[in-house]
Amino acid sequence: MKVSEAAAAYRKALELDPSLVAALINLANIHYGRDELAEAQALYERAISLESDFFEAHFNLGNIYHDLGRFTEAQACYREALRLNPYYADTHFYLAVTCEKMGLSQEARPHWRSYQQLAPNGEWVELAREFSE
């Protein structure tokens, strides 16, 4: 199935049942992948309003806020994502990067270390090692 066909199928499913959180998330992921941030943001926010404990929505919404330079909001989303799943290495990485961009290096350090522990062979482990010292 092509991405455009999948998006159409998710839209149709949401017409039939606007509370299908999985369809909202999957459609948001498609928009995010196309760099359609406003559409993706609205869908993630709607999914969170229906099911507040959906990790992926918080993490991806944090990525959107980060991409938009809205670091305080990104930080809040990443913190909530970590509350829901403290073992996802990329959340620690992006929270650390966000804290650094906000001038909060001390706050970033434990997340750099967590990233290294959770993803010892991760693509950003050298960067994390430099910042965590």
PLM segments and residue spans:
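Structural signature of tandem alpha-helical TPR/SEL1-like repeats
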Residues: M1-K12, A22, G33-R46, E56, ...
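Canonical tetratricopeptide repeat
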Residues: N26, N60, Y94, A128-F131
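Short, structured interface segments that constitute the first stable element of a domain
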Residues: S52-H66
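TPR/TPR-like alpha-solenoid helical repeat scaffolds
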Residues: V97-K101, N121-E133
